[in-house]
Amino acid sequence: MMKKIDVKILDPRVGQQFPLPTYATSGSAGLDLRACLDGAVELAPGATTLVPTGLAIHIADPSLAAVMLPRSGLGHKHGIVLGNLVGLIDSDYQGQLMVSIWNRGQDSFTIEPGERIAQMVFVPVVQAEFNLVEAFDATERGEGGFGHSGRK
């Protein structure tokens, strides 16, 4: 059975004026986050801004986190990506979800109220445990770094 996360809605316009976040298909990993704005915001080339989503989250389960990712169409067609490239939401964060938006394009871009601006994906978390060792067990690859395994 698929695990569910409780997402609180802070802004009463979400679900009324702006649609609730949804998964586009049964196989969608990400759900769309919308700009919960009172009016349009123009973003000049090279500029960044924080945009509220109207949602708050407390994942609570330390085995889960969420990541905010750019929407591929906005990045490819308009140069609109996340200001921090990927937003990480830890399980113990409790608060409103804000999206840092960066216009890396050459033209101004207008963010409209209710526009889909990013997507959020929930992911499992594995925490590393560090152990000081003298050497690793030998592998076929060894210390081969960038490009070591070839292109074909």
UniProtKB/Swiss-Prot annotation:
Q: Which co-factors does it depend on?
A: Mg(2+)
Family annotation (InterPro entries)? dUTPase, dUTPase-like, dUTPase-like_sf, dUTPase_trimeric
Q: EC number(s) for this protein?
A: 3.6.1.23
Q: Which reaction does it catalyse?
A: dUTP + H2O = dUMP + diphosphate + H(+)
What does the record give as its pathway?
Pyrimidine metabolism; dUMP biosynthesis; dUMP from dCTP (dUTP route): step 2/2
Residues that hold substrate according to the record: 71-73, 84, 88-90, 98
Function per UniProt = This enzyme is involved in nucleotide metabolism: it produces dUMP, the immediate precursor of thymidine nucleotides and it decreases the intracellular concentration of dUTP so that uracil cannot be incorporated into DNA.
Question: What are the TM regions of this chain, as residue ranges?
Answer: none
Species lineage, top-down?
Answer: Bacteria, Pseudomonadati, Pseudomonadota, Gammaproteobacteria, Enterobacterales
The answer to whether UniProt assigns keyword Metal-binding to this entry is yes
Entries under Pfam families matching the protein: dUTPase (PF00692)
Name assigned to this protein: Deoxyuridine 5'-triphosphate nucleotidohydrolase
